[in-house]
């Protein structure tokens, strides 16, 4: 077991990608602590709240005295320039950028040598659909925060980010064009992201830090122009 007796913190770990990541670490022997707004058997709280983050960090450190791996996964609000208010935009940045920064700061002196931070960003950190400004800004900030933290916290802590594309967290099966538009002819699965998170936080990735890995089935590399190769813009 690669992570036996390691202490792993996962934000937004109640469902979806976060839940999958948490379960994968548990399956390899780790102690996993989750913080999420959703009611359940974990620390319940909104990571946009500074006081909640401080309370959560005290809880984790009192219980374990250290954190080996921090996974910043919690999902920011997605609203666009037409409807997103000033307060909502700032809230998205608190969840998506400020909370990952502050948790890294709170745990900074309690990371053992060889620790790892994994930031779950998004392929939207480099490409966009209309009306997604709050989310896109948060993910872009998180990707940039990754390389900044890697320099500040090294060599004790490695910091990397993952930018998922379309990851299906539902029970719906997607086929046809939804799948075949991807170069691998399928939509992503939470395990695709969890596998990379575990690799990046393992000793096998000991020479990787400050990096961003895109996992999107090739979508961000597909050049699309109206009228070429059957694509059309409507």
For each predicted feature, which ranges?
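Active-site helix of classical SDR
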Residues: 104, 138, 146
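Conserved NAD(P)H cofactor-binding loop of Rossmann-fold oxidoreductase domains
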Residues: 73-78, 218
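Short C-terminal tail/terminal secondary-structure segment
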Residues: 209-234
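Substrate-binding pocket helix/loop in short-chain dehydrogenase/reductase
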Residues: 80-93, 178
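Canonical Rossmann dinucleotide-binding motif of NAD(H)/NADP(H)-dependent dehydrogenases/reductases
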Residues: 2-31
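Alpha-helical segment proximal to the catalytic Tyr-Lys
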Residues: 109, 151-155, 206
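C-terminal helical subdomain
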Residues: 161, 176-208, 215-217
């Amino acid at each position: 077991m690669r992570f036996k007796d390691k202490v792993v913190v996962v934000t937004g770990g109640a469902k979806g990608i976060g839940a999958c990541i948490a379960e994968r670490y548990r399956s390899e022997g780790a102690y996993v602590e989750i913080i999420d707004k959703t009611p359940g058997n974990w620390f319940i709280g909104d990571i946009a709240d500074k006081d909640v983050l401080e309370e959560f960090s005290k809880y984790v450190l009192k219980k374990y005295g250290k954190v080996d791996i921090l996974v910043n996964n919690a999902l920011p609000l997605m609203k666009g320039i037409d409807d997103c208010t000033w307060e909502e935009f700032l809230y998205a940045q608190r969840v998506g950028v400020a909370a990952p920064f502050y948790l890294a700061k709170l745990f900074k002196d309690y990371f053992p040598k060889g620790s790892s931070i994994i930031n779950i960003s998004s392929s939207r950190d480099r490409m966009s659909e209309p009306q997604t400004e709050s989310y896109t800004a948060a993910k872009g900030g998180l990707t940039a925060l990754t390389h900044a933290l890697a320099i500040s916290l090294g060599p004790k802590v490695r910091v990397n980010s993952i930018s998922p594309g379309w990851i299906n967290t539902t029970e719906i099966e997607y086929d046809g064009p939804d799948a075949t538009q991807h170069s691998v002819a399928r939509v992503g699965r939470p395990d695709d992201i969890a596998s990379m998170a575990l690799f990046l936080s393992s000793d096998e990735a000991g020479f990787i830090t400050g990096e961003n890995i895109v996992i999107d089935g090739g979508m961000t590399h597909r050049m699309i122009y109206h009228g070429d190769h059957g694509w059309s813009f409507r």
